[in-house]
Regions:
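Short acidic-hydrophobic, aromatic-tinged amphipathic segments that line or gate anion-handling sites
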Residues: 254-261
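Internal catalytic-core helix/loop-beta-alpha segment
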Residues: 154-198
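Active-site acidic carboxylates
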Residues: 42-170, 264-273
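N-terminal export leaders
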Residues: 13-21, 27-29
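N-terminal secretory signal peptides
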Residues: 1-15, 38
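Boundary at the C-terminal end of the N-terminal hydrophobic targeting segment
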Residues: 33-34, 39-44
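A short glycine-rich beta-strand->turn/loop micro-motif centered on a GG-aromatic cluster
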Residues: 202-206, 223-238
Length: 274
């Protein structure tokens, strides 16, 4: 598939978000979370774009909170986005930070004794067989215009990227997000979290300003305590990440780096041993 076709498909998926992102980013800089540090807008992503914790999160003992019953949730970290041949491969996420940072987060969560649930949630862009409204139908069709994928290639497009597939263990959940931007609608995730008495959800994935943010908002509205690992998430465009991270951090959840996540878990383990 030629690069131009990739770009048309990738841009169409985000087209209607442009005005929303601009408006919310402006709101976050006009006094909401005014103490948040300036992110490096020109950075290619990663920990340098992660804002300082918003004032409300600084009042919390994050070590204690991250020692509560927890779940790890990966969103849309599939071959579609990480492989050059994928439907969204032109975004070049393999060249960015989300994959190595996610591996770091998963390994740390596995080593902790309070992570009760691991979910690997796919997001298919080929959604012709999904339940859909009139809006969904035209949006889903627009995402894949010009793409000529066989059924086998469509299936491979939505497979978990190999580096993360190697980290999946028996008992982990693997399923697809069915709604536009929330895994809390129409999937087994709510029952999984409820049955395992989860309080905290740690999110990684793509796209930061779409499914990750949507799931973070849903987690808050359902009474959970979400964390977003900033360098383990990507927007479609790196330049959109600072605004998205600030917005999530100001309104919905603490945004921390993968290194800080590991340190907080280690501190919690040390406290329990003491």
């Amino acid at each position: 598939m030629i690069e131009q076709t990739h770009e048309v498909s990738d841009l169409s998926r985000r087209r209607f978000l442009k005005s929303t992102v601009v408006g919310l980013a402006a709101a976050s800089t006009l006094g909401l979370g005014a103490n948040t540090s300036k992110a490096n807008e020109s950075s290619a992503g990663g920990s340098s774009t992660i804002p300082d914790l918003a004032p409300q999160w600084k009042k919390l003992d994050l070590v204690e909170i991250l020692s509560r019953p927890a779940a790890f949730v990966s969103i849309s970290q599939n071959k579609s986005l990480y492989e050059s041949w994928g439907a969204q491969g032109a975004e070049k996420h393999r060249e960015r930070t989300s994959l190595p940072a996610t591996i770091k987060v998963v390994n740390a969560a596995r080593a902790a004794n309070n992570f009760r649930s691991f979910s690997w949630i796919g997001y298919e862009v080929f959604r012709e067989n999904y339940p859909q409204s009139t809006f969904d139908k035209v949006q889903y069709e627009t995402w894949v215009e010009g793409l000529n994928f066989s059924p086998e290639k469509k299936k491979a497009d939505n497979e978990l990227v190999d580096e993360l597939k190697a980290l999946v263990q028996p008992g982990d959940l693997q399923f697809n997000e069915l709604a536009l931007q929330s895994s809390f609608v129409g999937t087994q995730l709510p029952l999984e979290l409820s049955r395992k008495r989860v309080e905290v959800i740690v999110f990684t994935g793509i796209h930061l300003d779409w499914c990750v943010e949507g799931n973070t908002r849903s987690a808050r509205d359902n009474g959970y305590l979400p964390f977003v690992i900033g360098d383990a998430c990507d927007c479609q465009k790196p330049e959109d990440e600072p605004a998205a991270l600030r917005r999530i951090n100001n309104f919905f959840a603490p945004v921390i780096s993968s290194d800080n996540f590991v340190k907080l878990l280690q501190q919690g383990a040390g406290t329990r041993k003491a």
